[in-house]
Amino acid sequence: MEVSPLQPVNENMQVNKIKKNEDAKKRLSVERIYQKKTQLEHILLRPDTYIGSVELVTQQMWVYDEDVGINYREVTFVPGLYKIFDEILVNAADNKQRDPKMSCIRVTIDPENNLISIWNNGKGIPVVEHKVEKMYVPALIFGQLLTSSNYDDDEKKVTGGRNGYGAKLCNIFSTKFTVETASREYKKMFKQTWMDNMGRAGEMELKPFNGEDYTCITFQPDLSKFKMQSLDKDIVALMVRRAYDIAGSTKDVKVFLNGNKLPVKGFRSYVDMYLKDKLDETGNSLKVIHEQVNHRWEVCLTMSEKGFQQISFVNSIATSKGGRHVDYVADQIVTKLVDVVKKKNKGGVAVKAHQVKNHMWIFVNALIENPTFDSQTKENMTLQPKSFGSTCQLSEKFIKAAIGCGIVESILNWVKFKAQVQLNKKCSAVKHNRIKGIPKLDDANDAGGRNSTECTLILTEGDSAKTLAVSGLGVVGRDKYGVFPLRGKILNVREASHKQIMENAEINNIIKIVGLQYKKNYEDEDSLKTLRYGKIMIMTDQDQDGSHIKGLLINFIHHNWPSLLRHRFLEEFITPIVKVSKNKQEMAFYSLPEFEEWKSSTPNHKKWKVKYYKGLGTSTSKEAKEYFADMKRHRIQFKYSGPEDDAAISLAFSKKQIDDRKEWLTNFMEDRRQRKLLGLPEDYLYGQTTTYLTYNDFINKELILFSNSDNERSIPSMVDGLKPGQRKVLFTCFKRNDKREVKVAQLAGSVAEMSSYHHGEMSLMMTIINLAQNFVGSNNLNLLQPIGQFGTRLHGGKDSASPRYIFTMLSSLARLLFPPKDDHTLKFLYDDNQRVEPEWYIPIIPMVLINGAEGIGTGWSCKIPNFDVREIVNNIRRLMDGEEPLPMLPSYKNFKGTIEELAPNQYVISGEVAILNSTTIEISELPVRTWTQTYKEQVLEPMLNGTEKTPPLITDYREYHTDTTVKFVVKMTEEKLAEAERVGLHKVFKLQTSLTCNSMVLFDHVGCLKKYDTVLDILRDFFELRLKYYGLRKEWLLGMLGAESAKLNNQARFILEKIDGKIIIENKPKKELIKVLIQRGYDSDPVKAWKEAQQKVPDEEENEESDNEKETEKSDSVTDSGPTFNYLLDMPLWYLTKEKKDELCRLRNEKEQELDTLKRKSPSDLWKEDLATFIEELEAVEAKEKQDEQVGLPGKGGKAKGKKTQMAEVLPSPRGQRVIPRITIEMKAEAEKKNKKKIKNENTEGSPQEDGVELEGLKQRLEKKQKREPGTKTKKQTTLAFKPIKKGKKRNPWSDSESDRSSDESNFDVPPRETEPRRAATKTKFTMDLDSDEDFSDFDEKTDDEDFVPSDASPPKTKTSPKLSNKELKPQKSVVSDLEADDVKGSVPLSSSPPATHFPDETEITNPVPKKNVTVKKTAAKSQSSTSTTGAKKRAAPKGTKRDPALNSGVSQKPDPAKTKNRRKRKPSTSDDSDSNFEKIVSKAVTSKKSKGESDDFHMDFDSAVAPRAKSVRAKKPIKYLEESDEDDLF
């Protein structure tokens, strides 16, 4: 059959029809796809957007079960159902915020009938018609979506409702929802029911009502929407817990559940429901810390063992996921706990904040204004803390309790566990034959194998000792012996941090090599088989540092594996310390006392050759083989003898036994001293028969020598203030007696050679550099001269040049301080049979007080500040005169700040700061040992740039300092400056540091450590010893002069008798001549006989004998021969001439006269002569220092202006108002507290009461001073006057006391030469130095005589002006206000004294000038007030002072000079002390010269600034003065 050609076409048509129908369907589906739903339909369709998931979820939740109570278990529930219940419950709780009278909530849960009811009293919902919506309010808010009373965000509410959904969502997801509310106000009761998911509203019922308001919501959840059949056990348990939540978080509300009142009395009792039956690690109940911070915040804290846990509520909503409110509270606690943990876990595993948080369980109940959440489920509160509407600052009591509640202990236990885990990773649990990664190990061939217990690991001190051991292994073989070199001393693991142990390569290598495992107990023999080595042999030098290394290794094993010590796991290899040989005989000694015993028992010991072995490196390879061949003699085993061994090791290395260690060392020093006195030999360990050693013996007989030598190296002697290294340097310099400078590096080599210095030369070079430094905060008296860059205050001396480039030589003062005449009375030490430095030198003043001391030894540390040279000299003179020494304050050369006493041995050191204007301050001095660069980097930079925690405080700063002076000009906003003033500028800018002197420990003259309670105790001890040694010096000189006098007398008589022919020597035998001389009464050489009596010659012979036997024998024979008359018979023939005869007679007479003069002098007279000579040279040195400072400054004369401009840049501004350092009551109380803790013998002289009195006195003094200033005639004040004249308004920043200086400074025009005359005047003043506090006041006021040192003390200082003492001048320079406060006393008297008297010689002031000064003073006093730290910058000084007595430094009023003493305040000190004080004052006036004398800076600023800008006629004269004083300063 053929196919019709139309058929395909028909088929196509059908296909097209089908396509058209499909397109039509597609068009319909667009409408179906894009649909619009009502709000109600949307909620039902997408419930998870509103109430959370409507699917069953299984998770861990806190629930309440009848039989268990609140517990944390796995529950299966529908979050949406839980949420709609919660919304109604929170609404009920919210009503408490609207009506505080609300008192009851009743919750009914009926699972059988699927019925939930929540009833609350308190103000109900208004039963009134809404005029806009035309329906009653209850129906509106429960039956209409998007209605709420919470939409006004301007109203701050602390309720849970927020978005207008809550109750409506419950209505929508219920099959039946009934609202019943009654309002007494509107006298109606409203009731209405909604059904079918709020789809159908029932009839509204309105009834008259006259009872108490209430609201009741009853609903039946639409379980089908939640895919549930009934309210199961889990969801009910969750709902019940929420009822308990409301009972705990809502105050004063009773909650009933199914008719029963819940037994919850408040948040605290609610928290207990969680912690019931919970125990901590020790089995005790958890401690709960509770605090009701305020009416909106309540916090509880306890320990958590399951990571961080929190139970928190915001406006009664349970925020199960926490939020910002929990973080806000937790972070406060964590911050404090982290600090505590870090302190208790020093060096352990680093602990971070989140790790601390993991041990906390926190409960927070908060009311927060308008809280925000990350979802409608309200589980996580997201509002920023700044918007909370309240703060929660936990009290110190809460924090303290939190620290003690067990959390810290829990964290520390966790830290230990973590540390142990980390340490165990470093150990290998498997024994290996080969070890990789330790290149310097020469492993024993059998190590780690079957015979590993027979292997010994030799640990050597350094690579050179390893070479020696390897040489010796050629004898014993390499199978059983391995060698590993240690790099110096290993860690004290008993006190090391976890990090140190983890990172310490030496310890990790030893563990790896030996195969040790932390926490493994090696009690039994089998456990030792797990080790790669069965023994460790320690091979170190036979010196004290070698002993220390042995001790540290013993400590390392004992601390981690004490059981190993019982197996004789440790042993040592000893080598000789001395070998003696004669012909082919050889003897070895292993301790010096044994060698000394041999010497004393061997008559001819001098004929033996002696070789000292300083370390293992001294031995040759041949000797190494000899040592190992005689292993029995050289191997000493450590034997465990019982608990006393454990106690001894712990004593030596435990941080907790510091006091026991002190007693241990004290007993040792006393025992050693007694043995010396009784002539007994020293104890020693290694005799010829020693084969083993107990740990107790090792610690108490060998290691103690290291501990003692550590103290000797670190703590100076009271006698000369030097440590052994410094003493060796001084000994070498005295011996070399260089007249020319020498390179530091070369001098270090010379010291090592001449004094047997056995340590690194680098430390020796640093010692030399430190002895020569003279910047502020270093030495008050440098014994060596710094010729080159020896460091400055910019970097605290760290900026010194390389020792190869700098030179030094003895200071001209050194031999005046350490007179050569005393050398014969000293006891010199011997090292390797070479005479080296003495046990101590005996200076004429206690150098330990002049230059201070600092050091940390074993059991003790020492810290003593510097004191003023002239004060000490004056006090020594007082002691010689039988008077009591005056109290002294620390003093640092050229320091211009103030030092005040807070309590006995407690001082506060203040820098200098002045206010230039409302936005600028000037810092012109930093506290002692606060270095300029460090201050800039650590204080000003963070203030300028801010940090993560603190915003910037200043806007800019400029630097104008030199290497000797400080000047920062700091800019800040007016508000910030005002706030800083209120807090205290010194405090804000960290310009105050404390100085505590409770550790004044020094070696006394017999070599025992002694703790001094006060500085005057040191002075008295030194005085008694020095006076005794002046007696010994006198005895020695009398003997020497007597012998020399007898020798000259014999020589003169011999020449005269020869001339007269009474003696004939020609052609006679020597023996006959000697007989004749003896018959005629001539003495055998008196000088030689006297020297031999002094045992000087034998000592020298003994030195030579050991080196050269023949010389020894020869010298012996000489000594043994009879009387010697060579001193007569060897005289040249020309002594018989008349000239020589007359000269000899003259010399004889002079020597006799010298002897008679010495006999008439007492030891005190000799001392006074030395002091006078020293002071004279000191003034010359200081004058030279001033001249050196002046070098390089702009020219004089016509160029003075330029010079002033330059100086003005580095000197303090004359316009500034000095800020008086504030000494607060808290500072004094803290100082007293420290004193009670640290000082056993308490000294109450500096009690706070006295300080307080002084503060009051200071205020009064300031007031008086300012009142008197206008008419005062004080020399210094006059200078101020010039300044004020210039400006008219302001006074020198250094008001009153400084003004005194200013007057001096005003003489800047005076050429430098004139400065010297002033100095002469100053000399007299220097006497007063002792009272640094009152220097100024004392000088000016004669009424305050008691305050300052008697004038007799001043004699040495010839340079000070009669009225101004050094210190007085210094204080002025540094701080006017300080001076004012302190010196106000003095300054008032100063003003009363005629200005001309002081200035005429120093400043060359004409009569009219003083008058001007007086007037200026008046204006100055008013205009240039010194600002107390708190006072306003621009107020008149008197007001500021009156207002803030606390800010004053505490100087007592003029009327109370004695009190001032007690309060004791150190004003700025100048390097030149009294001599230069006057000059410095002048120089301070000159700003440009500030660099010369730092102490002058402040004063100089005033004057200098004033002079250049003088505007008034008077000002011109002052300008001239300023220039002159400037030059003086330069001196």
From Swiss-Prot:
Cross-link (Glycyl lysine isopeptide (Lys-Gly) (interchain with G-Cter in SUMO2)): 17, 156-157, 261, 352, 386, 397, 416, 418, 425, 440, 466, 480, 529, 584, 599, 614, 622, 625, 632, 639, 655, 662, 676, 1075, 1114, 1196, 1204, 1228, 1240, 1259, 1276, 1283, 1286, 1363, 1367, 1373, 1385, 1422, 1442, 1454, 1459, 1484, 1492
Region feature (Interaction with PLSCR1): 1433-1439
PTM annotation (Phosphothreonine): residues: 282, 1205, 1244, 1327, 1343, 1470
Annotated positions for site Interaction with DNA: 489, 492, 661-662, 723, 757, 763, 931
Cofactor(s) this protein cannot do without: Mg(2+); Mn(2+); Ca(2+)
Motif (Nuclear export signal): 1018-1028
GO cellular component terms, semicolon-separated: chromosome, centromeric region; condensed chromosome; cytoplasm; DNA topoisomerase type II (double strand cut, ATP-hydrolyzing) complex; male germ cell nucleus; nucleolus; nucleoplasm; nucleus
UniProt remark on cofactor binding: Binds two Mg(2+) per subunit. The magnesium ions form salt bridges with both the protein and the DNA. Can also accept other divalent metal cations, such as Mn(2+) or Ca(2+).
Tissue specificity of this protein: Expressed in the tonsil, spleen, lymph node, thymus, skin, pancreas, testis, colon, kidney, liver, brain and lung. Also found in high-grade lymphomas, squamous cell lung tumors and seminomas.
Protein name: DNA topoisomerase 2-alpha
